[in-house]
Amino acid sequence: MAVSGCTNDNSFGPIVQGCRGDFDFTLRFQNIILGILPAAIFILLALTRVATLAFRSRIVGGKVLQFTKLAVIAATAALQLVLLILSSTSNDESVDGDTFAVANSALGFSQWIVTLALSFAEHSRAPRPSSILTLYLLLQILLDVTRCRSYWLLATSFQITRYAGVFTATIGLKVITLLLELQNKARWMTWRKEDHSPEETSSLFNLGVYFWLIGIFRNGFKKTLSIKDDLYLLDHEMQSKILLDRLTISFAKSSANVGKRFRLAKALGRALIVPLILPVVPRIAMIGFQYAQPFFIHALLEYLIHKDVPKNDGYGLIGAALIIYAGIAISDALFWYFHQRCLYMARGCLASYVYRSTTQGKMTDIGDAAVLTLMSTDVERIIYGFHGLHDFWANIIEIGLGCFLLQRQLGLAFISPIVVILLCVAATTAIAWAIGERQSRWMAKIESRVGLTSSIISNIKSLRISGITAPVRDLVQKMREQELSIGNKFRWLLIMTATVAFVPSAMSPVVAFAFTNEQLDTLKIFVSFSFITLLTNPLGAMFQSVPAVIAAFVCLERIQKFLEIEPRVDYRKSSRPLSPADGSLLEQDDEKPLGLGQGASKSLISIVDGSFGWTSEKMTLTGISVDVPVGKLTLVVGPVASGKSTFCKALLGEVPFSSGEVIVPSTEAPIGYCEQTPFLKNGSIRDNIIWHSVYNQTRYEEVLDACLLRTDLDILPEGDATTIGSNGIMLSGGQKQRVSLARALYLETDFLLIDDILSGLDNSTGNDVFRRVFGPNGLMRRRNATAILCTHAIRYLPLADHIIILATDGTVGEQGSFDKLAETGIYIPTLGLSDADDASSTNSSIPVEETVAATMPVPLTAFSTVSIGHLEAESRSTGDAKVYRHYYQSVNGWATMTCLLSGIMYAVGRNFPSIWMGWWGSNSFDRTSSFYIGIMGLFRGLQIISLFLCATAVVIFMTTQSGKLLHNEILNTLVNAPLRFFTTTDFGAVTNLFSQDMTLIDGELPISLLNTVIQIFDVFAMAVVVAVGAPWLAIAYPVVFSIIYMLQMFYLRTSRQLRLLDLEAKSPLYAHFLDTIRGIATVRAQKLRDQEILFNQDLLNLSQRPAYLLAMAQRFLATFLNLIVMVLAVGVVAISTQLRTNSGFAGSSLVTLMSWGESISSLIQYYTQVEVSIGAVSRLKAFAQNVPSENLDQEDLEPAEEWPTQGDIAIRGVSASYKNDDESPASEDDEESPNLALEDLTILVKPGQKVALCGRTGSGKSSIILLLLRLLDPLSNQSENIVIDGVPYNRVNRSILRRRLIAVPQDPVFLPDGSSIKENLDPFNVASDEECLAVLEDVRLTKFATDHGSIHAGIRADELSAGQKQLFSLGRAVLRRRVKQRLFSIHGGVLLLDEVSSSVDSATDNLVQEIIKEEFADYTIVMVSHRLNIVMEYFDSVVVLDRGRVVETGDPRDLAKTEGSWFSQLWAMEKK
């Protein structure tokens, strides 16, 4: 003891007495706490880690580095052995101390032996540096520095000096070891560096300060980022496939809890249990560092108050400040790293599971809007809501600590803040009861609006032809306003919750000080205030997060409800196993190719007493029993709504309600299925045909020839690489059907199921396709395939091997071979067909080049690239003030002024009390405590009121105003965009504007804007308070704020791009989702569900990359700002301790610093969120300004409502082109273009004349209808060459033109599901109920209305068959004519019909023509028709087109008799 001079070195202490300036720990304390305890824990953890790594294979090279590490570690171990020998043999109590010193040295040597093994295993078998080893080395270095100081202070003898020297040498080697262990091993990994993220090889320190993101920031600052080239890949654990498997297993384990609340939440927690727990340790550490602040403030104020304290204590306080605030920064960084990682793993789990469940669902349970909203909006709200998930348990710990420590300062008065908190909890709980319900209602409104908008985008052509764009546009805008109104009810609750959340932090100090009996001085005021701040700040954050957390659980419940919907059950039965060779339905030697007309053979598919329906109340097919022969062609015919499409779906196992048996060879074999409405994806023609199959050039060319697609591809600028647009919008109806048929034929299968796929083809093209595919030498016969073709084309019946005739009541009327049914049946004899027709038809061969005319809409890929690319460039522009101006122009000025003024008042109310407490502590005004408490309460009340006013102005008024105007702006742009825009622009990208971007404007943008305004004024007010306590620190403000400004500029360059990439990466994900929903029957029939799930996972992984990196980038910013606050805090302490400043103002500064760092971080983050959220406004602005309108300046003429009265149409010398270079009308330079849709067109139609447009597929028939409706523009110098009833066509406003002309599209359109029969029939609401009922009766749909109760009942479009939809669409046209006649007593007008009878049988076609003949007797009619018998019977004139030219006009009856005429050739083909 004599050597050390200390009285307690051999006791636990921990502080020494009587030596080393009384500023050191005792040796026993150092041996136990700084040596033995951490070493023992490390050895235990290290051995466990070595055992884990022992079973892994070697994945890292770098043997030179590994040898260097081991050499340094061995040298350190040797020195540790020397220290053990010295401590064991020394007689000096200063070194030996007691037996704990020897134990410490022994453990020190042992731990380095273990370190040797751990380093060896970690280097070769783990991708990143050892977290256990590097953390322990850092800790040990810090602890050893303390011990080293003690030894050198004791160095009064050779033995002690020798021990201290060796100990110092070990510290140097430990530093070297730490630096070596921190070396990144990416260059030595055995994997490809390009396939992995730097995150996977980063050390814990690298992750903690987000240094692994530097590459992203550097690239983002220099150039425009792209996802595939610049963004890091996701690591293995975040891959969607891995996450999906985890959630699937976890969710399946709780199958007994179906329908119970929180089932999905619990399953998600189990699936991500490790990522969920990892943030706990740094969060606990953060609590410790935060609660060290009040003790630190207490120590600092005591130091400043007592002038006789040793100066060393001041240095200790500076060191303590460094440790505390650095600890807060690092623990916060690590917490958010692990937490954000967990959140995006949850996103991957949920999004992939929703998609997979969608592919398993029944067709009736899958709706575009609802399911897409689950995958997009609901999942995003879950991630947003769970940001504060760990705060709930952490806040309980913090509240308990805060109450305990506050009680020690204020006595029983600590209860008063608890009362305030409990009252706020009660208020928040009461509000929370309504949050879930109001949010659900709001989300339902969003679903409906997005669903209708997506329907508009996909059906814009038919909507414009129908002339109902305006009422549909008004309906969408009305739904948007209702959505905002419902959303405001939810937002009011958010404002109330936010206001209540700030009450504890604002009013608790006032209440606590008012009720305390303690004597309040500077020390007690500021220490108590710091405890209250730590007690109430977490509660404020928690209260604010309550609505978001509740919303997250509501969204989880919505997703769970969807996931628990009973999946589609394949009720079909297999009769024999799948062939192992290629998945075909036929056994390899089962059948030989059979000739035509050999009759039925072995049954491939059987239905026994089957009944099938789409609702439980009504069966579409009843009691049917059929057999489908192998290797044969079976035709299914029947009247409209007899159930032909349902028959196809029944064979696929897709009808939700069924009875009886459906027997197939194998339920796992693919079926080449073609839907009646072709399902095509937004991709190239080649991609649509091949899909997920392996490319086989021979098979591919064979299919192109069979479907007559070669000529179509030859005239396209990019051939089969041409992008066809969403829903194949750039293709004609017949071309869509042939591409769909080509996909089915390309599939490796022996069974084709074709649902009326030839209805959109002219007779000659249809016959040739039929011959090439189903004829005696057709592709189907050569493959010995079995085919079922549902059709209205009775001319093919003699070619069938087997015929199934469905009756109107959904039963099988007759079935058998053609010969059998012709002899004994009822249906066939009435058709006038004979077997002789077979030979003449099948032997005729039309050359391919004559079958398909070389005129079609040309894909405008250049336009697509320019428009979308321009939107991206506009969105990524840095600091575009025009975007902010555009946003603020959409809101009222008074709301903006209210926001700014209330923000200033909030900052004053929140921060002035800190200065006031300094005056109070020194009693500057010589008044009682009540005076100071009263003034403090006044300012805190001002804070709460100002917050409420600011939130109301931004979240309610600004959101509502901007939401209406911005949506209306882009909606008008959408409905007025030229048709060319829709043929080339990605469906998902446009839908994303109305879903994701609108969600940002309604939700994230106003909240971020509110917080930014609040934080701007708050930060500047805090800066004033800090400067009052440390005036010299104010000198550094320009430097500090310059650093922050440069940081945010550097940061924003990248974060803005990441946010936009995040939004853009979701577009293909959502588009694919919608494609899957539309084509789910095709996907499942062709057994491509697994491939589609994998493709979805690839898209999800792609969308995760920018979203995850953006979240990490935001935490990088927060960490950097926390480190800046650390520097400021150390500066305040240094100035205060060295200059001995006023204790009251020093307390103000430190108390303010406790929140200032968080406020600065929040300001930058909120401002960044505003910047990236304003990107949504930028995209909307760019969309509205850069997407041209189809309306031109001179089109301002609005004819009288009764126009046209006569129907006189004159088209003289007009050519038209689908322009691809700009949005101006096509110019005369295009006249020689080979891509002219119409060339030198002259058609004169007299009033009341009935004109049919005929010609082969692609000849330009539909283009004339589009021309008359201004959906296709004539060349610019010919726009005056079209006149209707004397009115110059080029002057009439386009939307008015389409309302005045009555047109019926080929593809009927309906209002969103749930709209009434009357609303669909009369979108303009100008007809009476009686008129609507009369029209329904005339089009034979009265029963449909009666089944629903009334015409005001809501309907779904899929309740109608394809034929019924056409009749309904015709009924809409009839109603418009009758209303016009009632209002204006006008009998004449113009009716345009685009192949309206393509989806109906001959009987229904005759009904359609009779209705047209009777209703539109005085109208001029222009109709596209492939059914020439109708033309012969009902039309006065026919216009025959070929390759966009009029090649013949005249009376169809005369032309049919004229030998060699174009029409006579078509008529001859029709007769065959």
Swiss-Prot record:
Task: Give the record's keywords alphabetically.
Answer: ATP-binding, Cell membrane, Glycoprotein, Hydrolase, Membrane, Nucleotide-binding, Phosphoprotein, Repeat, Transmembrane, Transmembrane helix, Transport
Result of knocking out the encoding gene: Leads to reduced virulence. Results in a substantial increase of fusaoctaxin A, and abolishes the production of fusapentaxin A and fusatrixin A.
Lipid bilayer topology: Multi-pass membrane protein
Query: Which amino acids does the record list as binding ATP?
Result: 638-645, 1255-1262
Supply the PANTHER family for this chain. Answer: ABC MULTIDRUG TRANSPORTER (EUROFUNG), ATP-BINDING CASSETTE SUB-FAMILY C
> What family does the entry list?
Belongs to the ABC transporter superfamily. ABCC family. Conjugate transporter (TC 3.A.1.208) subfamily.
Its biological purpose is as follows:
ABC transporter; part of the Fg3_54/C64 gene cluster that mediates the biosynthesis of the octapeptide fusaoctaxin A, a virulence factor that is required for cell-to-cell invasiveness of plant host. The 2 nonribosomal peptide synthetases NRPS9 and NRPS5 form an assembly line which likely utilizes GABA as a starter unit (loaded on the unique module M1 of NRPS9) and sequentially incorporates seven extender units composed of the residues L-Ala, L-allo-Ile, L-Ser, L-Val, L-Ser, L-Leu and L-Leu, respectively.
Full protein name: ABC transporter FGM5
Lineage, broadest ranks: Eukaryota, Fungi, Dikarya, Ascomycota, Pezizomycotina
